[in-house]
From Swiss-Prot:
This is Gastrokine-2. Its main location: secreted. Heterodimer with TFF1; disulfide linked. Interacts with TFF2. Keywords: Disulfide bond, Golgi apparatus, Secreted, Signal.
Length: 184
C-alpha cells in the first residue's frame, strides 16, 4: 500500500510540474511567401507568457508579466528593450490567451484583426533608474543589459512620422508593434 501511495504522490508532483509550462509553436505566413515561426511559452507558476518571433534581424522576444502587470519587448535589430504597463482591457487574460493559442494551433482558424501600437520617443522615454522589483524578474532577465524605454499605447500609427516600426508579441494574435522616431 505504501509503494502505491508513494507512486501516486510522485506522479501527481510531476503532473503538476508538467502543467506549469506549456509551449506553442505557430507558423504565420510572411509577406515574402515564407513562414515566420512564433514560439509562445505560457508559465502558469510565474504567470507569464513569453513570445519569441524568429524572423532574422526582425526577431524579438516579448514577455507578458501578468503578475507585475507589465509587457517588455526586446527587438534584435534595435538592441534595446521596451516596457509598457499592461492594459488588461486590451490584453487577454493568461488563461484566455492559453485557450486562444490552443485553438489556433489545433484548428488553425482563429485570427484577430486588432493591433495594439506602442509608441516611444527615444530622446524622452529612456528609463535610467530602473526599479526591477516593480517590473519583476522575468522582465529583468530579458532587459537587464539593454537600454530600457517607456512606451505608451497609441490608438493607431500617426499620419506623419519618421522612424520605423517592428512587430513584436504574437503577429497574428496580439499584433503589438514598437514604433520609434518622431511623430507629428
Amino acid at each position: 500500500m505504501k509503494p502505491l501511495v508513494a507512486f501516486l504522490v510522485v506522479l501527481s508532483i510531476f503532473g503538476i510540474q508538467s502543467q506549469a509550462e506549456e509551449i506553442f509553436n505557430i507558423f504565420v505566413p510572411s509577406k515574402n511567401g515564407g513562414n515566420i515561426q512564433e514560439t509562445v511559452t505560457i508559465d502558469n507558476q510565474q504567470n507569464t507568457a513569453t513570445i519569441n518571433i524568429h524572423s532574422g534581424s526582425c526577431s524579438s522576444t516579448t514577455i507578458f508579466d501578468y503578475k507585475h502587470g507589465y509587457i517588455a519587448s526586446r527587438v534584435l535589430s534595435r538592441r534595446a528593450c521596451y516596457v509598457i504597463k499592461m492594459d488588461h482591457k486590451a490584453i487577454p487574460a493568461l488563461d484566455k490567451l492559453q485557450r486562444f493559442l490552443y485553438e489556433k494551433q489545433t484548428m488553425n482558424a482563429i485570427d484577430s484583426p486588432e493591433y495594439t501600437w506602442v509608441r516611444y520617443n527615444p530622446l524622452k522615454s529612456l528609463i535610467t533608474k530602473v526599479d526591477w522589483f516593480l517590473f519583476g524578474s522575468p522582465i529583468r532577465q530579458l532587459c537587464k543589459h539593454m537600454p530600457l524605454y517607456e512606451g505608451e499605447v497609441a490608438t493607431k500609427p500617426k499620419e506623419v512620422s519618421t522612424g520605423a516600426c517592428a512587430k513584436v508579441g504574437l503577429l497574428g494574435i496580439l499584433g503589438v508593434s514598437i514604433c520609434g522616431g518622431i511623430h507629428l
